[in-house]
A protein has these predicted regions:
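Glycine-rich, acidic
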Residues: 211-212, 216-364, 368
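C-terminal catalytic lobe of FAD-dependent flavoproteins
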Residues: 1-70
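Short glycine-/aliphatic-rich beta-strand segments at the starts of folded cytosolic domains
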Residues: 129-155, 224-246, 367-377
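Glycine-rich phosphate/pyrophosphate-binding beta-alpha loops
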Residues: 29-37, 277-278, 401-409, 413
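Acidic, proline/glycine-enriched N-terminal capping motif
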Residues: 24, 51-172, 177-179
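Glycine-rich, small/acidic residue-mixed loop/short-helix segments
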Residues: 336, 340-429
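Glycine-rich, acidic/polar active-site loops that bind/position phosphate-bearing ligands
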Residues: 183-210, 230, 282-287
Length: 429
């Protein structure tokens, strides 16, 4: 026997037309038991030969499979160099021409820096600079039930999010744990545009699709991530620069913070979002990916007289710490809830059921034990490595999640988890 298949059952299968060894094996499950053909391989071949009239050598089902003879992927020629998937933004060769140092972000090749990141940060703070943000996720939601669907998927509220408005949003798991943040914009009536982090774009799109199959929602979900690229242009001179090339009123009154607008540039449609991940005046500009390279070069050429410089991910990390903005997954882990992470303001729990609501209610009732807080070092202090312990009175009480030298402030800054009772400004560790 193999997988409880008897000789009689094998003969019946052959009589029913499964007289080819491969089809016989799959129809009867011969050779698919725990041994994966190791013990019954020869017996099955002989029985199949007797019942089909083939020779034993012709009736061999297939070779044994793991765990009898595991096949290493390392046998594939040049795996490390030729089989690693790589994703590049449309501006990839523009970055190479500028002498970029790349960073691997999953499969993406992202610009890490073009020069000293400290100098790049000062260009942002004192002038105007641009970063490629094409790797961010872009998901479009629409349909009659889109508000109800978003209210179930996300802990925030969006019914009053008007056309042209943008809102910060977080996502939590069914366990109430924070795993994503981004923005949601209503760019047209009934059409919502969600911007996600680079690492979670595919997971969130899959999550939306999965939940649509479980509920009676009339909603359309489009993953626009591959077809839409983008840049973030930021700095004190950005309004002056963009006003010179785009026919749009960039004044604070006409284009306030956390709003979005649509425009065209040399015939290319643009979606513009006034958001501030860097802590500086800035506009994220999204456009069809086929125009990515030409628009990057256009911005660099037109921005030369304004001192426009490119900057990379490492500089962005410095700037976001100067602002005090967390990154889920870097500053949080599998135990971090939104209240402790300081983003409880994005939760509206006075609505009907949504993903993670029960656990959020439990978290809210508990006394907060730890908090994620920004910190600064004394001038001259060594910048700690991410993950080192926070020490108070000779005992570890928390951990550093992010740390960088701030060229703007002149001392080290970062984010750390500390006891809630010691999280007020001014405490020393």
């Amino acid at each position: 026997k193999c997988m409880d298949v008897t000789r009689k059952e094998a003969c019946m299968s052959i009589d029913e037309g499964f007289d080819q060894v491969e089809s016989l094996k799959r129809y009867t499950s011969l050779g698919m038991g725990p041994c994966q053909g190791k013990s019954c391989h020869e017996a099955v071949a002989r029985l199949a030969a007797m019942d089909t009239g083939l020779t034993a050598s012709d009736a061999v089902p297939t070779t044994m499979r793991p765990p009898a003879f595991p096949v290493s992927f390392g046998l594939l020629s040049g795996r490390a160099h030729h089989l690693g998937p790589i994703r590049r933004t449309p501006m990839h060769h523009c970055h190479i021409d500028l002498g970029v140092k790349f960073l691997d972000a999953g499969a993406w090749k992202r610009p890490d820096s073009y020069m000293d990141p400290q100098q790049e940060a000062l260009y942002v703070r004192k002038g105007v600079a641009m970063i490629d943000v094409s790797t961010l996720g872009k998901i479009e939601l629409s349909g009659p039930d889109v508000i109800e669907f978003m209210h179930f998927m996300l802990p925030g509220k969006f019914a009053k999010l008007d056309v042209g408005r943008t809102r910060y949003a977080i996502m939590i798991g069914e366990d109430g744990i924070l795993f994503e943040d981004g923005t949601i914009s209503q760019i047209e009536k009934g059409k919502y545009y969600i911007s996600t982090t680079t690492g979670n774009q595919d997971a969130i799109y899959t999550l939306f699709q999965w939940w649509l199959t479980t509920g009676d929602y009339d909603v359309q979900v489009k993953n626009l991530s591959a077809g839409i690229s983008g840049v973030n242009i930021t700095g004190p001179k950005v309004r002056e620069f963009l006003s010179s090339i785009i026919d749009l009123d960039f004044s604070n009154e006409a284009f306030p913070y956390m709003h979005n607008r649509q425009a065209t540039l040399e015939g290319v449609p643009l979606n513009l979002f006034r958001i501030g991940f860097t802590g500086e005046l800035g506009y994220e500009i999204h456009f069809p990916s086929e125009f990515g390279e030409s628009l990057w070069n256009y911005f660099m050429e037109k921005g030369e007289s304004f001192g426009l410089k490119p900057f990379g991910v490492e500089t962005q990390r410095i700037l976001r710490l100067e602002k005090g903005h967390l990154i889920p997954g870097a500053d949080t882990d599998a135990l971090s809830n939104p209240y402790e992470a300081g983003v409880g303001f994005a939760i509206k729990d006075d609505k009907e059921d949504f993903i993670g609501k029960a656990f959020l209610a439990e978290f809210k009732q508990r006394e907060i034990e730890n908090r994620l807080v920004p910190y600064r070092l004394q001038e001259g202090d060594t910048i700690p490595i991410d993950g080192v312990a926070v020490i108070a009175e000779g005992k570890p009480v928390g951990r550093v999640t992010s740390s960088r030298m701030s060229p703007t402030l002149g001392y080290g800054i970062g984010m750390a988890w500390v006891p809630a009772g010691s999280s007020e400004a001014g405490n020393h560790f």
